[in-house]
Amino acid sequence: SPKAIAAIKAGLDDLHRYPEVVLGDFLRALAAHTGLELSQLVVGPGSDELLTRLVHAYAGPGDELVHSAHCYGKFPIYARMAGAAPVAAPDRDFRVDVDAVLSCLTERTRIVLLANPDNPTGAWISGAELRRLHAGLPDHTVLAIDGAYTDYVSDPHYEDGLALAAGANNVVV
């Protein structure tokens, strides 16, 4: 298309330069889309890298990461990579059991990492249950929600956790 050709020609003068490091336009669009502040956003080369960095930032040797029993298979690996112990909270009918997650928390729990919706089961946690889980966390524990499959859920009781993250300093989505 003529517009595509014009855009390519317009960018030729800067091809030898590094791309914008701070991703300003992208981050502003992401903030507008999510309702979060720019200071609450972190982007990276993919969820695997971001989750690895998140776990390393908050957990280490002697710490614990709580996840659901039927979770994405790399969640316990992320914990071990950081030197932390993975703790599997029992599920109920292949769904996250918030009471079981809360009962697994100890002084050493630094992260509760859950996929919502879950991978591989597809089960999801309602907004009310997410808020109840968050309310039961000690101050030293981060609730990390992997929302890779959020767009597949259309039930009105589902919440992706962004509103929770907007108002809390220990929630990561």
Model region roles, listed by residue range:
Residues 30, 75, 79, 137:
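Short hydrophobic alpha-helical segments of the AMP-binding
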Residues 4, 26, 50, 74, ...:
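Hydrophobic alpha-helical segments typical of transmembrane helices
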Residues 47-48, 72, 116-120, 149-150:
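Short glycine-rich anion-binding loops that position phosphate/pyrophosphate groups of nucleotides
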Residues 80, 98-108, 120-143, 147-173:
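Active-site pre-lysine segment of PLP-dependent enzymes
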Residues 16, 24, 40, 57-114:
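PLP-dependent aminotransferase-like
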Residues 45, 91-96, 154-155:
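Short gly/ser/thr-rich secondary-structure transition/capping motifs
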